Swiss-Prot record:
GO MF annotation: an example: NADH dehydrogenase (ubiquinone) activity
Domain of life: Eukaryota
Gene that encodes the chain: MT-ND2
The UniProt record lists the keyword Membrane: yes
Lineage: Eukaryota, Metazoa, Chordata, Craniata, Vertebrata
Catalysis performed (reactions): a ubiquinone + NADH + 5 H(+)(in) = a ubiquinol + NAD(+) + 4 H(+)(out)
Function: Core subunit of the mitochondrial membrane respiratory chain NADH dehydrogenase (Complex I) which catalyzes electron transfer from NADH through the respiratory chain, using ubiquinone as an electron acceptor. Essential for the catalytic activity and assembly of complex I.
The protein's name: NADH-ubiquinone oxidoreductase chain 2
């Protein structure tokens, strides 16, 4: 894609998300979602091939259906209240419709089927945007309408998302699909705490985006797309192999890494609100995610691909890829746990 066209498309994606974030009027929020959706399609089709075209079509159809459902909920709310404001949501039918539409945009279960397929069909950089930036706008609306949402509906979607995200990733060998199922599971954790403490959902989103960005950048730096390709990493780039190991364990929520903070806080919040059984169930299902992350760390750091090369390290050219953002992302992804009290004061 030409740099000027890419700049225009990216600025439209960012503008659409910002419009959703700063608006309190349902019509401008809907327009922001549409701008974002239409501008992301060329980014998904950056490498023009049948797989990218199929993935983009699936994404467009899913998001268009979600937008239609969202507009239907907005119109029902408008007819009943006569207002366009976001915070005025007294009708449960409109609220449930909007929740379902936003769940479809986020890829929450049972509307999750498009997430692995679309992520696998697009380039790694497009998948990174899809699983990070594209989550911000729908979650910001969920944050605003949290008091008027049905907590039972949200909890059911959270349970299904955590289960699907854990089970779905167990038999995968493609890294993009693994990260897609990981995204579904993380969204489930965020939704579980939305009605009790929406601010904690923002903390979880911030840490999730940081960890996922770092992971995608490491995979792109290493040109890895499958579990098998990770086994070449230790021969070529031992430092990158160590960093992949750390970020994978952090995504799995293993202490003392940063990924443990949101899980710890969410379990504490659920227990505080007499949801101890739910907290126990979610903690147990998190082990499914941890298992496939452990598989990836084993493939990266504890295996070496058979080679006839007698040298310990393979000779290679110095990487020309830009890694400016990588060090701060890795530090935040792995070393935030001691700063938990300070982080909590920010949210």
């Amino acid at each position: 894609m030409n740099p000027p066209i890419l700049a225009i498309v990216m600025s439209t994606v960012i503008s659409g998300t910002i419009m959703v974030l700063i608006s309190s009027h349902w019509l401008t929020i809907w327009i922001g979602f549409e701008m974002n959706m239409l501008a992301i399609i060329p980014i998904l089709m950056k490498k023009f091939n049948p797989r990218a075209m199929e993935a983009s079509t699936k994404y467009f159809l899913t998001q268009a259906t979600a937008s239609m459902l969202l507009m239907l909920g907005i119109i029902i709310n408008l007819l009943l209240t006569g207002q366009w404001t976001v915070l005025n949501m007294p009708n449960p039918v409109a609220s449930n419709m909007m929740t379902a539409a936003l769940a479809m945009k986020l890829g929450l279960s049972p509307f999750h089927f498009w997430v692995p397929e679309v992520t696998q069909g697009v380039p790694m950089s497009s998948g990174m945007i899809l699983l990070t930036w594209q989550k911000i706008a729908p979650l910001s609306i969920l944050y605003q309408i949290a008091p008027s949402m049905n907590p039972n509906l949200l909890m059911a979607m959270a349970i299904m998302s955590v289960l699907v995200g854990g089970w779905g990733g167990l038999n995968q060998t493609q890294l993009r699909k693994i990260l897609a199922y990981s995204s579904i599971a993380h969204m489930g954790w965020m939704i579980a705490v939305t009605t009790y403490n929406p601010t904690l959902m923002l903390l979880n989103l911030t840490i999730y985006i940081t960890m996922t960005l770092g992971t995608f950048m490491l995979f792109m730096l290493n040109s890895s797309t499958t579990t098998l390709s990770l086994s070449h990493t230790w021969n070529k780039l031992p430092l990158i192999a160590s960093l992949i190991l750390m970020t994978m364990l952090s995504l799995g929520g293993l202490p003392p890494l940063s990924g443990f903070i949101p899980k710890w806080m969410i379990i504490h919040e659920l227990t505080k609100n007499d949801m101890a059984i739910m907290a126990t169930f979610m903690a147990m299902t998190a082990l499914l995610n941890l298992y496939f992350y452990m598989r990836l760390t084993y493939a990266t750091a504890l295996t070496m691909f058979p080679s006839t090369n007698i040298m310990k390290m393979k000779w290679q050219f110095e990487s020309t890829k830009n890694t400016t953002l990588l060090p701060p992302l890795i530090m935040i992804s792995t070393m935030l746990l001691p700063l938990t009290p300070m982080v909590l004061t920010l949210f």
